Curated annotation (Swiss-Prot):
Gene name in the database record: yegS
Residue span(s) of domain DAGKc: 2-133
Top-rank taxon: Bacteria
Entry protein name: Probable lipid kinase YegS
GO molecular function annotations of the record: ATP binding; lipid kinase activity; magnesium ion binding
Function summary: Probably phosphorylates lipids; the in vivo substrate is unknown.
HAMAP family found in the cross-reference section: YegS (MF_01377)
Similarity remark: Belongs to the diacylglycerol/lipid kinase family. YegS lipid kinase subfamily.
Active site per the UniProt annotation: 271
Species the sequence originates in: Escherichia coli O17:K52:H18 (strain UMN026 / ExPEC)
Keywords: ATP-binding, Cytoplasm, Kinase, Lipid biosynthesis, Lipid metabolism, Magnesium, Metal-binding, Nucleotide-binding, Phospholipid biosynthesis, Phospholipid metabolism, Transferase
Ligand binding (Mg(2+)): 215, 218, 220
GO CC term (a single one): plasma membrane
Cofactor descriptive note: Binds 1 Mg(2+) ion per subunit. Ca(2+) may be able to substitute.
Enzyme Commission (EC) number: 2.7.1.-
């Protein structure tokens, strides 16, 4: 195999006993690739490992985990200053892997690793909330956020993305819409939202296409609001074709402002953020990511 620059894999601590991954890394090392491995234990580890990666001079930092791990690693990368900032590689090892799935990262570990190390590095956007928290995939609000936040880990491990739907059905009696006002470029809406999706990527919640037209390098955020009087039809509508659905409001903008009379919660790549005021803006070409040539989220 041709020579490739060194990489550093930041592995979510939950995946340390993954024997096939260990074997795949050993095989690539035997082929001459330099792959450093670091394991996260607590929040902040990824940022420290990215600093170490820069000192090692690696070309790629690989996020090994789910959407939360990808978020933490990509956030640390965009905060780097100077030249020679490593590209982001993705090794999907989480429950839902929404971002990795939507950009067509291979499911096979060996293929995903090779792409993360040797794939083309393409500039992609990220999004920032209130000038602080970032997300690479999607911000979701409404009852969907509460479902994904509260779904038990054992249920997610057993059933994957379907677990969110099952838990949502179990919680329907306590889920209410969120009243809010949303503004963007040439966009204004106010009312009761059952689900809010603001996407740099397209899917969340274990495979639900909340923002099916989103692209990760167009400098825009895609917005979708699901409205209606009943929770169950809205939940079901995310599973089927929604063409000409009167309960769906759509918009696109480089920024959105959300105001609510009460505290609401957004889920940012799996991390909850609560408040009454949110300013969400796109950060164009914020980092480079190694993606497959058939990635459908590129313009």
């Amino acid at each position: 195999m041709a020579e490739f620059p060194a990489s550093l894999l930041i592995l979510n601590g939950k995946s340390t006993d993954n024997l096939p991954l260990r074997e795949a890394i050993m095989l690539l090392r035997e082929e001459g690739m330099t792959i450093h491995v670091r394991v996260t234990w607590e929040k902040g580890d990824a940022a420290r490992y990215v600093e170490e990666a820069r000192k090692l001079g690696v070309a790629t930092v690989i996020a090994g985990g789910g959407d939360g791990t990808i978020n933490e690693v990509s956030t640390a990368l965009i905060q780097c200053e100077g030249d020679d900032i490593p590209a982001l590689g993705i090794l999907p090892l989480g429950t839902a892997n929404d971002f990795a799935t939507s950009v067509r990262i291979p499911e096979a570990l060996d293929k995903a690793l090779k792409l993360a190390i040797a794939g083309d590095a393409i500039a992609i956007d990220m999004a920032q909330v209130n000038k602080q928290t970032c997300f690479i995939n999607m911000a979701t609000g409404g009852f969907g956020t509460r479902i994904t936040t509260e779904t038990p880990e054992k249920l997610k491990a057993a059933l994957g993305g379907v677990s969110y739907i099952i838990h949502g059905l179990m919680r329907m009696d306590t889920l209410q819409p969120d009243r809010c006002e949303i503004r963007g470029e040439n966009f204004h809406w106010q009312g009761d939202a059952l689900v809010i999706g603001i996407g740099n990527g397209r899917q969340a919640g274990g495979g639900q296409q909340l923002c099916p037209n989103a692209l990760i390098n167009d400098g825009l955020l895609q917005l979708r609001i699901f409205t209606g009087d009943e929770i169950l039809p809205a939940l079901v509508s995310t599973l089927k074709s929604d063409e000409d659905n009167p309960n769906i409001i759509e918009g696109a903008s480089s920024w959105f402002d959300i105001q609510a009379p009460h505290e609401i919660t957004f889920n940012l790549d799996g991390e909850p953020l609560s408040g009454q005021n949110f300013h969400i803006e796109i950060l164009p070409a914020a980092l480079r990511c190694r993606l497959p040539p058939d990635c459908p989220l590129l313009r």
